[in-house]
A protein has these predicted regions:
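Alpha-helical transmembrane segments and their helix-helix packing motifs
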Residues: 1-171
Length: 171
C-alpha cells in the first residue's frame, strides 16, 4: 500500500533505501549459499531463480538448464534484471542523491560505501572464471558475502547519520 499511497518525500526515500538494502542483502545471502552448494549440486540454481523472481528472464536469455555463471550474471551484474544486485545498487545511488543533508557525520559516507561496493561488484569477471568452476563458486560466494557485509555497513551509516541523536566524542 505504501508504494501507491505515500508521497515521495524524505520518508519515502528512507523506505526505498531500506527496501533496496534488504533486497540486496537477502539476494546476496541466497546467491552465496547457492554458489557454495553448487560445487556439488547445481540443481539448487532452479529454486534460486524462482525465489529471486528471475526464472522467466533466465529462460528468455538462456535456452539451457541453469548453471552458475549465467545465473550469477543475471542475479549480480545484469542492469536489465530489476532483481539483480547491480540494479539494487543503481536504485540506491538514485535514492542517496535525493536524501537530505542530515544532522551529523559525513553526509557522503554512505555514498562512498556504495561506490566501493559497486566497484567491487564490477570487478567480477565471469569470463575469466569459466574454465575454473570450483574457483568460480568460491569467488562468487566470497564476493556475495563481502557485498552483503558492505550493505549492512551502509545501513549502519544511514542510521548513524540520520537517526542517531548522540554525538561521538573525538578523543
Amino acid at each position: 500500500m505504501q508504494q501507491e499511497n505515500m508521497t515521495r518525500g524524505h520518508a519515502w526515500q528512507f523506505l526505498e533505501a531500506g527496501r533496496r538494502l534488504e533486497r540486496a542483502i537477502n539476494g546476496l545471502s541466497l546467491i552465496a549459499g547457492s554458489a557454495r552448494r553448487c560445487r556439488t549440486d547445481d540443481a539448487i540454481l532452479t529454486p534460486l531463480l524462482e525465489v529471486t523472481d528471475s526464472t522467466m528472464t533466465y529462460r528468455r536469455l538462456h535456452f539451457a538448464r541453469p548453471s552458475l555463471l549465467p545465473v550469477a550474471d543475471l542475479l549480480l551484474l545484469s542492469e536489465e534484471n530489476p532483481r539483480s544486485t547491480s540494479a539494487q545498487f543503481h536504485r540506491l545511488a538514485r535514492v542517496f542523491a535525493e536524501l537530505p543533508a542530515g544532522t551529523s557525520g559525513n553526509p557522503g559516507h554512505q555514498r562512498e560505501l556504495l561506490d566501493g561496493l559497486r566497484s567491487e561488484l564490477a570487478s567480477l569477471n565471469l569470463d575469466a572464471l569459466r574454465s575454473f568452476p570450483d574457483a568460480a563458486s568460491h569467488r562468487i560466494a566470497t564476493l556475495c558475502s563481502d557485498l552483503a557485509t558492505g550493505c549492512e555497513s551502509i545501513s549502519a551509516a544511514l542510521t548513524e547519520h540520520f537517526f542517531s541523536h548522540a554525538h561521538r566524542r573525538s578523543d
